């Protein structure tokens, strides 16, 4: 009866291994470049990571640029027209435009500067001077209606294209994947499980691609992240009395470029507007405020908008959360002085330290130990048994507890995480550190004589005198006064008194005043003999 179950589990493990191997071949590890990858995907307007990978592969294998329409080289007149458009923009705006991405039309590219000015260009677009109309300012209402209609149309086309690409990708992935070798004993249940796993994998990939932390809502014609910004509106400065506004007749600026721009009159010079406002001091303040709010270019070149600062300040204030008030809650059991800042911690303390205090007892009659927690009791019970479940992977030695295994493993790894804070001694276990600290405690108890200058302690007063003469020689004359000697009875005289015969005198630290001085000399007789004589 056990053989069919074993065969089923073996087949299940084999199927899982094949599925994992197939999935591992499809995975690509980006490492620390995930953020750049997601930003590139959003910048190019792709919704799936596989679309971006296919685009990069096509661009690498193709001989020409993928963004261009066809492998044919760009005509010279088309490049000249692009240079002309860039030159026209440079006359009106000092910012350098950059390639934003493909436009709405086939083969159309869109350039945009930091001020929001855009212009489109097609390689096949070569206008003649007769076809180029003169530049005429468009009204704000026509621009807004045209932009809204064009954006709605492009969004609808982008959604249809995205849906078509997703369906095609799923079909190709299902077609390319090799079918698993189905065993007739497996049955239809495993086939259903495989289909469900494939569907879950596809849904997970879509969720990961859509719910990445760097995703933004993007439109097909706008490859930049959808940042809320005010709609560009034309800024037309009124000429002075008797002044005729200049119209560049020799520079061909097509209507397609003016229509593709979100703001037709935004190509007018923002710098010239600022210079005009600075020259004319009679302009009211309200007009200056309206023009600075309407023109996006003036916002980019001038000082930051105060309204934006107020908005950001309000957002920052909203995000600041008030710190919760911490209440001091002492334990009300007699004899316990513990204080807690959280009600949950207090209840936990009462439950396991007072109410159910050591309710878990050891089942061994000779032991009689009790514990507050059940896990501590389980670890203790292992000490009474011969079970050694924790085995060292280096030497195959077994242990009863995991803590003993961790300490033993440090012998093989050479790790010594515990360190003495006094001398820097390192060890592997806490018992060795406690034994080492006893030496410092005994030594500190033996050092009874401190130095009054630096606080260093010594075992003998002579060591204090030698230390003072060596480390603090400049402070010794101050301490040789009688008042200072009487005020510090714990320290002997800095220098021992020398007799003419070479006898040295040293002050004793005994409590009795009688033997306060002692005379020691190897070649001189005792002091009592000299007194009698």
UniProtKB/Swiss-Prot annotation:
GO-annotated molecular function: DNA-binding transcription repressor activity, RNA polymerase II-specific; RNA polymerase II cis-regulatory region sequence-specific DNA binding; zinc ion binding
Ranges of compositional bias, category Basic and acidic residues: 149-178
Acidic residues bias: start-end ranges: 190-208
Domain of life, source organism: Eukaryota
UniProt feature, compositional bias: Low complexity: 481-492
Repeat is among the record's keywords: yes
PTM annotation (Phosphoserine): residues: 233, 471
Entry protein name: Zinc finger protein 692
